[in-house]
Regions:
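A short, N-terminal "cap"/entry segment at the start of jelly-roll beta-barrel domains
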Residues: 1-40, 45-47, 146-174
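Conserved metal-binding segment of the jelly-roll/cupin
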Residues: 39, 78-99, 107-108
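A short beta-strand-loop-beta hairpin characteristic of the jelly-roll/cupin
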Residues: 50-81
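Structural motif
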Residues: 63-65, 102, 129
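Residue-level recognition of conserved beta-strand positions in structured domain cores
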Residues: 68-70, 97, 105
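A short hydrophobic beta-strand segment most commonly corresponding to one strand
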Residues: 99-118
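Short Cys/His-rich "knuckle" micro-motifs
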Residues: 130-137, 168-174
């Protein structure tokens, strides 16, 4: 069991860990039921995370935006400093954090469950689905990187079958 600690002090001492490209740190790696992460900005990811369980966002410093794919449309949800938001399960979402922002995110642990994760990309021009992965999540700090690299290495994956637009390569992942 981990003893109580001062979260603000932890953030001050560990800001250097909350940097691109993914910017998150799991605070309770041995927890059995929940992933409790501190996430920093800026981030510039274009993928949409898919989680078969709810996610709780609590914005500690600065404001952020969560883009969500709802009924085939890109919706924008703003979470201001001090606000919290419970994202329902099964909604592809892209949390966008500007520079100098910090948030707390709580998700269910998926190891030992039949829940899977996903990463989805949508066309910047017409919002048509480009490519997606579904996979069992074992380590929230590292499992996405392999899929990012594979997606950005493939022009076919990045090319919209609807309008022909090609998503730019994110150089951090090639």
């Amino acid at each position: 069991m981990m003893l109580p600690f001062n979260l603000q002090q932890w953030i001050e001492e560990n800001r250097d860990l909350l940097k691109p490209p993914i910017n998150n740190k799991n605070l309770y790696k041995q927890a059995g039921d929940f992933i409790v992460m501190i996430v920093g900005g800026p981030n510039a990811r274009k993928d949409y995370h898919y989680n078969e369980s709810e996610e709780l966002f609590y914005q500690l410093e600065g404001d952020m935006t969560v883009y969500a794919q709802i009924d085939g449309k890109k919706e924008e949800i703003t979470i201001k400093e001090g606000e919290m938001f419970l994202l329902p399960a099964n909604i592809p979402h892209n949390p966008v954090r500007p520079e100098n922002t910090i948030g707390l995110v709580i998700e269910r642990v998926r190891i030992g469950t039949d829940l899977s994760d996903g990463l989805f990309w949508f066309c910047d021009k017409c919002n048509h689905p480009l490519h997606h992965y579904r996979f069992p999540l074992t380590n929230i700090e590292t499992d996405f990187l392999t899929r990012f690299k594979e997606f950005y290495a493939s022009e076919d994956y990045r090319t919209c079958k609807n309008c022909g637009d090609v998503m730019e390569v994110d150089e951090r992942y090639v």
